[in-house]
Curated annotation (Swiss-Prot):
It comes from Danio rerio. One of its GO terms (cellular component) is extracellular region. It is found in: Secreted. Residues 1-19 form the signal peptide. Glycans are attached at residue 47. Belongs to the UPF0669 family. It holds the Pfam family UPF0669. Residues 142-159 have a biased composition (Polar residues). The keyword Cell division does not apply. The keyword Iron does not apply. This is UPF0669 protein C6orf120 homolog. Residues 141-165 are annotated as: Disordered. Keywords: Glycoprotein, Secreted, Signal.
Length: 186
């Protein structure tokens, strides 16, 4: 009987110990990332807190739940994303990380949800700007292949792709009609 209670005591203390270890670790931050903001807050169980992101470029949201469990929902379609209307999410019990692509429309809506398992969740979110993505865009913009001259835009292979796509659609329609005929006959 004593081993059962001792095991139960160890299991009940384990989440607190893991939580302590989790908070003491700092996330790895590459040299290309620039810290833009640090946002701290509290959120009640089952509630949302909303933020707006206006920065252009590739943005990394790194959120750590200091107490409880806060989840992260992101969208470029609505400023109030939730678990039904998000484009990106991170709902882990540990650090939540979301990479917002540079081609997302601005402003980007950020929803922070307090998990109902905890009366209150406390979080800290660090907002990073990825300079490496900007450098890659500049390199791509300024590069050209050997058959192009500098300063001229690259030509896409549009007509060939369009013909293949039209042919694929025709085959799909034809196969669909044949399936219907076979289903009627048999």
């Amino acid at each position: 009987m004593v081993p059962f209670w001792a095991g139960l005591l160890v299991l009940s203390a384990l989440p607190q110990t893991l939580g302590f270890l989790q908070h003491s670790e700092e996330p790895y931050v590459p040299g290309e990332w620039v810290l833009l903001h640090v946002v701290q807050g509290h959120i009640g169980a089952g509630n949302y807190s909303y933020l707006r992101l206006n920065h252009e470029g590739r943005i990394i949201l790194h959120m750590q739940s200091l107490k409880g469990d806060a989840d992260l929902y992101v969208s470029d379609k609505t400023l109030r994303p939730n678990f039904d209307t998000y484009k990106l999410q991170s709902t882990t019990c540990g650090p939540d990380v979301v990479v917002v692509p540079g081609d997302f429309l601005r402003p980007v809506g950020i929803g922070i949800y307090g998990h109902p398992s905890y009366m209150e969740s406390e979080f800290e979110m660090k907002v990073f700007y990825d300079q490496k993505a900007l450098a890659e865009i500049e390199i791509e913009k300024n590069s050209y292949s050997s058959d192009e001259t500098p300063g001229q835009p690259r030509q896409s292979q549009g007509p060939e792709d369009t013909e293949e796509e039209e042919e694929s659609i025709l085959w799909t329609i034809l196969i669909g009609i044949l399936k219907i005929i076979l289903e009627i006959l048999f």
